[in-house]
Amino acid sequence: MSKHIGAQMLEFTQNGDERGYLVVLEGMQDVPFDIKRIFYIYGSDSTVVRGQHANRRTKFVLINVAGQCKVKVKDGKGNEAVFVLNRPHTGIYLPEMMWKDMYDFSEDSVLLCLASEHYDSAEYIRDYAQYEKEVNQ
């Protein structure tokens, strides 16, 4: 597991044989929070940028279960890192208050997103200047 500015790459156990592979994810075991929401992103063109926000309370684990994409994370203090998600048994953990941009999606990309909280639009910060202000207060 590598860690960058609060984001962490996670590697999940693969169980496999001649029939293929199985990856099991359980909240508070393989994922560092109870999973309250699951969604996935697919059909995004390679020029599309998704995300472009931070969450005040929600933590995420992002896993590209098919294809690949890149995730750029920023901490609002001048630090950033780029992760390539291209293996279905790896993911990235994003704590709350982490700015995220997902981009460079392959045609077959399916990005699975596990969230620690139910959806609440009020906890999203969609303006980067506002995000920096909140992080640095």
Sequence positions of predicted segments:
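Non-catalytic, conserved peripheral segments adjacent to functional cores
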Residues: 1-90, 107-108, 113-114, 119-137
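Well-ordered alpha/beta subsegment
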Residues: 87-91, 97-104
